[in-house]
Regions:
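Donor nucleotide-activated moiety binding/catalytic core segment of transferases
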Residues: 1-9, 258-271, 278, 310-344
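Leloir-type glycosyltransferase catalytic cores
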Residues: 374-428
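Amphipathic alpha-helical interaction motifs in eukaryotic regulatory proteins
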Residues: 32-42, 273-277, 288, 305, ...
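A donor-sugar binding/catalytic signature common to diverse glycosyltransferases
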Residues: 32, 52, 332-377
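Short coil/turn segments at secondary-structure boundaries
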Residues: 50-52, 58-61, 223-227, 300-303, ...
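Short, solvent-exposed loop/turn segments at secondary-structure junctions
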Residues: 51-54, 215-218, 292-296, 318, ...
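Catalytic donor nucleotide-activated moiety binding site of glycosyltransferases and closely related
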Residues: 243-258, 283-326
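Secretory-pathway glycan-assembly enzymes, especially type II membrane glycosyltransferases
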Residues: 1-263, 279-281
Length: 428
């Protein structure tokens, strides 16, 4: 009993978070699991420090992205969270762990470890030293065989405790306002609550669709598919594959046709345009493009823009002064797109991946509509050179009837953060 009291009052869980890919989305999941592990151990959690992401070169910290006070407040009845390690543990730094074997560092957490693993292997460290650092920590907590309370806590962290910092929400709300009331225009308000309030009062809000599109060079090259850009593009992508992965791209063993019919080729902006048109969207649809950088630039999205002239993005809707605080910061740019995606009437993503999974799950949790394109069907239809437009449209509509937000239950081994039902839902 004494040991436990000691643990709950003094222990710290210090987590290393080396980020990769779209940074803040990976972090979502790590921080949720960190809270769960702290709960299992009755330990205090120290807000993690982020390392600069080598790919995105983004030095944004947890506190630059998320509203930390909100985070701590929402979880105050669940666990104790502190922003910094207390003075007596100041020696417990990233450098300290990087430069030698340390008794307070736990390196052996297996992938998808059980709750028992933590009480057997980390609790003794906490009891002896008052602090433990678990690194690496990605995917180190199982999704199955966890108590209901722990699952609920993970849901609470992911869907309620993590809120973006006020300036991201303010910018996001301005974008949403301008999409809903295109004629009025509005200044970015630093008081996001006020702006949200005004939004609710105004009448005749227009609807908008968010299209999440990831079609960057990295992805195009890695898919090993062809994208109709002719010989020059084929050579450019082949060269990129050679330089970046020394040719080791798993998909290379398949032909373009095989990959396409399996739905393994990213959809091009043009293909997505045809999909949207087949589903009944038209030139009166207000479309927001949530996208980082499109390989091929404006030329590649020309067809999409022709079909949907009311297409907007972060850049078209804001001035450069308004974007100054997020300029060049991949995680903040992604956060703004995430925020707008969460508030759209319809969300459609043509790019499976972290952002896709996170937004789809969050929208499921909030019961908002999402369209999930069938990549395999699209691949097959685009290969068919004799298909007419009415046939294409018919096939698309038929296949997408039950891909418009119907809840899919999590299966064993799947992530709670991708499939929040049933664990995060009421009466589960
Ligand atoms: C944590 O606290 C709870 C409630 O006080 C207790 O039931 C549980 O055994 C504790 N767990 C550990 C690992 O100390
Ligand atoms: C939208 O499409 C309709 C029907 O194809 C056409 O008549 C109309 O001119 C278009 N409007 C704009 C603004 O392009
Ligand atoms: C192409 O589509 C047409 C019309 O649906 C169909 O009859 C034909 O079999 C398809 N061809 C291939 C190669 O799948």
């Amino acid at each position: 009993m004494i040991a436990i009291a000691y643990v709950s009052n003094r222990s710290m869980l210090f987590l290393s978070t080396l980020l990769n890919y779209v940074p803040f989305l990976i972090l979502f999941i790590k921080i949720c699991d960190a809270v769960a592990v702290a709960k299992i151990l009755n330990a205090t959690l120290v807000i993690p420090h982020l390392e600069v992401n080598p790919v995105w070169q983004d030095s944004s910290t947890f506190m630059d992205i998320f509203d930390v006070d909100h985070f701590i407040n929402i979880l105050q009845d669940d666990i104790l969270i502190v922003k910094e390690v207390p003075v007596e543990f100041y020696w417990s730094t990233r450098e300290y762990y990087a430069t030698g074997i340390r008794a307070t560092r736990v390196k052996t957490a297996p992938v998808h470890a059980s709750a028992n693993w933590y009480t057997e292997n980390v609790l003794p460290v906490l009891q002896s030293y008052g602090i433990a650092a678990i690194a690496p920590f990605s995917h180190r907590l199982a999704f199955d065989d966890m108590s209901k309370d722990i699952q609920r806590l993970r849901c609470k962290v992911n869907f309620q405790a993590l809120a973006f910092v006020p300036h991201i929400r303010a910018l996001g709300n301005s974008l949403i306002n301008r999409l809903r009331y295109p004629a009025q225009g509005s200044e970015v308000s630093t008081n996001y609550l006020e702006e949200l309030d005004n939004t609710n009062k105004k009448k005749g809000a227009g609807k908008f669709v968010v299209l999440h599109l990831r079609f960057d060079k990295d992805m195009a090259a890695h898919s090993a598919c062809e994208f109709g850009g002719g010989k020059a593009e084929r050579l450019a992508l082949a060269k990129y594959r050679q330089v970046i992965w020394q040719g080791r791209v798993l998909n290379s063993q398949f032909t373009d046709e095989e990959l396409r019919s399996q739905g393994r080729c990213p959809l091009t902006p043009e293909e997505i345009g045809l999909l949207l048109a087949a589903l009944g969207f038209d030139n009166s649809t207000r479309l927001y493009l949530a996208s980082h950088k499109v390989y091929g630039g404006e030329a590649r999205i020309l067809t999409l823009r022709d079909l949907f002239p009311l297409m907007e993005d972060k850049k078209s809707l804001t001035s450069s002064e308004e974007r100054a605080s997020i300029k060049g910061k991949a995680s903040l740019l992604a956060a703004v797109d995430y925020y707008v995606s969460m508030h759209s009437d319809i969300f459609i993503s043509a790019s499976p991946g972290n952002m896709h999974n996170a937004v789809v799950a969050h929208r499921t949790y909030e019961n908002r509509k999402t369209i999930r394109p069938s990549m395999a069907l699209l691949g097959q239809l685009f290969l068919n050179k004799t298909l007419t437009w009415p046939e294409f449209q018919e096939a698309i509509r038929e296949k997408h009837k039950n891909r418009q937000g119907q809840i899919r239950l999590r299966k064993t081994g799947q992530s709670l953060y991708t499939y929040p039902a049933p664990d995060c839902m009421c009466n589960a």
